[in-house]
Amino acid sequence: MRKKLAPAAVAAALLALAIALVGCSSGPSDEEVIRQGVSEELAAIKAGDDELISSVEEGAGEDLKTLGIDARDFMSAYLDGFDYSVGDVKVDGDSATVHLSITCRSMGEATEAFMGAYGDALANAEDLTDTDALYELAGKTLLESLSATQPKTVECDVQCQKDSDGNWSYADGVSEQMSELFLSQ
């Protein structure tokens, strides 16, 4: 798709992958084109592909590095248990609705767990006056909190639109909708 579907966020970074969904009159139906494009995009997220990792590194790599966390390790922990299914695709002229079922960890829930666990770790830590040691403790606690957060399944509908060239893309607002889903579900 042309517009990006932000599947996950790390701090201020939204993770995005783009796939062009090009429909042609003699090829597959609009429903098939949309289903294939959405499925390929979500499969790339599930696999933690290099484009996804690069997106995380670009958006939050320095913050993760400060905590002693590699972007690939972070995404591996976040995506553990990630799954999806593409349900009904309903096309109505130049617009379409795609029903998705997504199973993933909630970044909001993981952050909340981290705050409590890090506070407890600081209260129980002795002689942690070195800034690097504090960051290392925060990084370790963040990964543990993320790994302890259980994946949840949520259902949502996303809107797609066809342009004048016959190409399908996500409608305006889908990126924000998916970011909200991944951050707070």
Task: Locate predicted features.
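Bacterial N-terminal signal peptides that target proteins for export
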Residues: M1-A11
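A short hydrophobic beta-strand element
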Residues: D94-I102
